[in-house]
């Protein structure tokens, strides 16, 4: 592939689907705090003036779903009824049952390492050396734009901003290398009393310029800031939100394949989540070790079975060692059985709410972002 464009998008913590994700993961964290062995599949639906929390949960813990929901919405910034959604007055409904005993008998084992996968499925992990966090640049900078929007909204720099926002960045590539940014889209919810010209100037100066590297911007870069001209009605008043509806935003922005399973609200026994994290960990360590410039991992499972049904390594012709050797290294250094990867990444802790906005990958504070096996892989591969 010679010259081409590639685009990724992100959404802010105040986007309706992300509100739902954060509530689901806040419930999960509260339960794991008391009961690390809990089985949680928590789904959330948000619309004007209401939140519905449902799913299947089996636990010895007791948590206050209503309080968790209100606190999460409050932290995001929906605290006035004029936004169409208010943490203090929205209705909170709960429809939670227990996990099926048919699933439990396939997952639970006396020997923990033989714990079966909570479902069948396929998961992907990806890494590339085009950014310092070993993530694709388009999704990385799309996330950083909406993170910056939240920052200047919350610290009072731009007090007329509201929680809902979206970003989209189109990068120019030449022979696989970034040569510039072709287009930037940023749409942000705002108060009624800000005019379009003032908004566009402030967004450019306070959000876009501090985030996007100047060497990638030029006179032909196109900027679309609130291109409809008005974005007052937003959040759950503008659109309903559902857990698990932003799976490409959550992962690699379309640069890598996706197995289809969402993450938020699921405890680590659900391989949709935990194995996707493990696949990222494997791919990132392979790239960090210098064994490839780009790496995509696929892993698959059968419900109730511990060993993965398949492991694939794709390096797009950038590998520095034979592909067959990479597979052997993965099997030697990474335990991808469900309980093995939970142990490997220390996943039975309340760390999930933070993942639910601005991407699950590329932020160094998560355990699956460690590159602690890179040197081991490099030595085992015989690279100097």
From Swiss-Prot:
Catalytic activity reported: L-methionine + ATP + H2O = S-adenosyl-L-methionine + phosphate + diphosphate
Any one biological process term the GO annotation gives: S-adenosylmethionine biosynthetic process
Protein residues bound to Mg(2+): 17
Gene3D superfamilies: 3.30.300.10
Compartments it resides in: Cytoplasm
Protein residues bound to L-methionine: 56, 99, 239, 270
CDD domains xrefs: S-AdoMet_synt
Class of the enzyme per the UniProt entry, highest EC level: transferase
GO cellular component: cytoplasm
Pathway the protein takes part in: Amino-acid biosynthesis; S-adenosyl-L-methionine biosynthesis; S-adenosyl-L-methionine from L-methionine: step 1/1
Binding of ATP, residues: 15, 164-166, 230-231, 239, 245-246, 262, 266
GO molecular function, one term: magnesium ion binding
Main location group: cytoplasm
Annotated HAMAP family: S_AdoMet_synth1 (MF_00086)
Job of this protein: Catalyzes the formation of S-adenosylmethionine (AdoMet) from methionine and ATP. The overall synthetic reaction is composed of two sequential steps, AdoMet formation and the subsequent tripolyphosphate hydrolysis which occurs prior to release of AdoMet from the enzyme.
UniProt xrefs under NCBIfam families: metK
Assigned protein family: Belongs to the AdoMet synthase family.
Subunit structure, as described in the record: Homotetramer; dimer of dimers.
Designated name of the protein: S-adenosylmethionine synthase
Originating species: Salmonella gallinarum (strain 287/91 / NCTC 13346)
């Amino acid at each position: 592939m010679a010259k081409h464009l590639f685009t990724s998008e992100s959404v802010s913590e105040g986007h309706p689907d992300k509100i739902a994700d954060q509530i689901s993961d806040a419930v999960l964290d509260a339960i794991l705090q008391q009961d690390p062995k809990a089985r949680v599949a928590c789904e959330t639906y948000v619309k004007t003036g209401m939140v519905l929390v449902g799913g299947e949960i089996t636990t010895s813990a007791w948590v206050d779903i209503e309080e968790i929901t209100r606190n999460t919405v409050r932290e995001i910034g929906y605290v006035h009824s004029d936004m169409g959604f208010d943490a203090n007055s929205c209705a909170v409904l709960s429809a939670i049952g227990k996990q099926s005993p048919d699933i439990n008998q396939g997952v639970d084992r006396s020997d923990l390492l033989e714990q079966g996968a909570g479902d069948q499925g396929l998961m992907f992990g990806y890494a590339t050396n085009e950014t310092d966090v070993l993530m694709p640049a388009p999704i990385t900078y799309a996330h950083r734009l909406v993170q910056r929007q939240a920052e200047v909204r919350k610290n009072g720099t731009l007090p007329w901003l509201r929680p809902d926002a979206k970003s989209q960045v189109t990068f120019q590539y030449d022979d696989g290398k970034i040569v510039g940014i072709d287009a930037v889209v940023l749409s942000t919810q705002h108060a009624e009393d800000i005019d379009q010209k003032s908004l566009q100037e402030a967004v450019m100066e306070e959000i876009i310029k501090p985030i996007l590297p100047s060497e990638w911007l030029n006179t032909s870069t196109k900027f679309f800031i609130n291109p409809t001209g008005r974005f007052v009605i937003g959040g759950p008043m503008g659109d309903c939100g559902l857990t698990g509806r932003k799976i490409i935003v959550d992962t690699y922005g379309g640069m890598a394949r996706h197995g289809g399973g969402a993450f938020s609200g699921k405890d680590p026994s659900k391989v949709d989540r935990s194995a996707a994290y493990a696949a990222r960990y494997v791919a990132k360590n392979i790239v960090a070790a210098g064994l490839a410039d780009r790496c995509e991992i696929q892993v698959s499972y059968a419900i109730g079975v511990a060993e993965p049904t398949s492991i694939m390594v794709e390096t797009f012709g950038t590998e520095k060692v034979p592909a067959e050797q990479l597979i052997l290294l993965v099997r030697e250094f990474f335990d991808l059985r469900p309980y093995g990867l939970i142990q490997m990444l220390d996943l039975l802790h309340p760390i999930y709410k933070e993942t639910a906005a601005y991407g699950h990958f590329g932020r160094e504070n998560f355990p699956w972002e460690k590159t602690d096996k890179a040197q081991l892989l490099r030595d085992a591969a015989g690279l100097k």
